[in-house]
Structure formats: C-alpha cells, structure tokens
Amino acid sequence: MAAGKEIRGKIKSVENTRKITKAMEMVAASKMRKAQERMRAARPYSDKIRNIAAHLSQANPEYTHPFMESNDAKTTGFIVVTTDKGLCGGLNTNVLRLLTTKLKDMQAAGEDAQAVAIGNKGLGFLNRIGVKVAAHATQLGDKPHLDKLIGPVKVLLDAYSEGKIKAVYLCYTRFINTMKQESVVEQLLPLTADRMQPDKTEHSWDYIYEPDAQTVIDELLVRYVEALVFQAVAENMASEQSARMVAMKSATDNAGSVIGELKLIYNKTRQAAITKELSEIVAGAAAV
C-alpha cells in the first residue's frame, strides 16, 4: 500500500492548504468591509472640496493655477498605485499592463517618464522596466494615512508646477463591486473640465475670502489633488481585499475538488489492492 500511503499524504497536504486559504478568505472578507467603509468615507471630502474650488474658480476667472494649465515639457509623471502583497488574482497585473501600453506610446513619441510608486508591486515593476522612480510609499498597512502619501506625491506635483513635466496620470484599480474591479490610467494633471465641474445640486454661494481668493483657490486645489490620490489608494485597497477574497475562495474550492479526486483515486487503489489480495488467497486455496 505504498501508493495508498503516498495518496493519503497528498490528501493531508491539500487539506492543510485548504484550511489556510479558507482562513485567508475570511480575513480578506473582514478587511474588505472595512476598506469599503474607508473608501466611502473619503468620497464626501473630495466631492466637497471639488465643489468649493469649482465655484471659486468660476466666480474668479481672472485667477489661474498651474494645476489647471498645460505646458510643453517632454516628460510625463505617473502615480502608480498597487498592492504591497500578492495573492490577489490579476489585480496588479491588469493595471501594470495598462501602464505598459501607455509607456510604449510615450516612448514611440520620444517622451520620457518618471513615476511615484505606491505599493511594493508597482515599485518592483518600475525598477525592472527602468522607469525613473522619483519617490515611493510602501507598507501603508490596512489603514492608509494621507500624511504618508503627501511627501512622495508632492514630488510630482511640484515638478508639474515648475513646468518640468507636462501631465500627471493616476494608475490604480477602481472599486466597482465585490466581484468587479476596473484598472484605470486617468489624467490627474492638468485638471480636466469634468474634475472642476461643480455639483448641479449644490447652491451657488457668494464667498468671503480670507486672506484672498487666490490664496484660498491655491490651497484648495492642492488639497483636492491630494484627496484624489488618497481616494485612489482607498479604492485600490478595497479592490485588493475583494480580489484576494475571491482568489482565496477559488483556491479553497479548487482544493476541495482536488481532495475529492485524490480520495477517489485512493479508494480505487485500495479496492484494487484488496481485490488482488483476495485473488491471491483464492488462488492459494485452490492450489492446496
């Protein structure tokens, strides 16, 4: 029964793996709910800043900000948001594939790129393909704080304000629902018209500025862009936990199927061994 013992060992090994993937699925489900709550909590903040900044900009068209103006630089910046850990299906692969397509188009046009990496997976990828990483933020944990993101992101924002890069793109995975996430590479700077469009349901107020309109608009636009980046990180984390939960559930289900197949093979092997022993006993008795 050497073969039977070997199969029993395989069954035990797969059962242990199934316990691990089941535990990871349950942990991911718990983290996913919390990540979704943080993602939803961040949206009203960025929406309110957008409304106020849009109203101020429309009421004071004589004021401009570098974030709303284009330039002729030959370098494009990317804020690449990925995960620190794996085991989340094709989440990182999909967004990095979109980024690669964008980089190839830029290379064909003779343009350069530099990036800020948020997450270990994106940082490793950018280093492998030779894209200049101006700054990075990793090991953000399950509760990302804006303070940890501002420093690295500010590197690209300052470069854009100084006219050193012509655009900044935000690469991340947008959360749609538990079973669906969408990889996106969207323009962050210069701010497009749709990003600066006030909510139609909001009242149009007359504001009193302190110290002045230009200072308020400048501060709000910086906070708004930072909020957009934070929102992308929050959505990416919700997507990560959803993808990990689905991946671990699939692994658990597959492990169950493998165990069933191995048990069937074990039973057939055991049955064949018993039949062989009985045949030998009968043959021996007949010889006597």
Curated annotation (Swiss-Prot):
A biological process term (GO) from this entry: proton motive force-driven plasma membrane ATP synthesis
Name of the molecule in the record: ATP synthase gamma chain
Localization annotation: Cell inner membrane
GO molecular function, one term: ATP binding
Organism: Polaromonas naphthalenivorans (strain CJ2)
CDD domains assigned to the protein according to its UniProt record, in alphabetical order: F1-ATPase_gamma
Keyword Cell membrane: yes
One of the record's GO cellular component terms: plasma membrane
Described function: Produces ATP from ADP in the presence of a proton gradient across the membrane. The gamma chain is believed to be important in regulating ATPase activity and the flow of protons through the CF(0) complex.
NCBIfam families named in the record: ATPsyn_F1gamma (TIGR01146), PRK05621.1-1 (NF004144)
Matches recorded under Pfam families: ATP-synt
Principal location class: membrane
Subunit organization: F-type ATPases have 2 components, CF(1) - the catalytic core - and CF(0) - the membrane proton channel. CF(1) has five subunits: alpha(3), beta(3), gamma(1), delta(1), epsilon(1). CF(0) has three main subunits: a, b and c.
Topological relation to the membrane, as annotated: Peripheral membrane protein
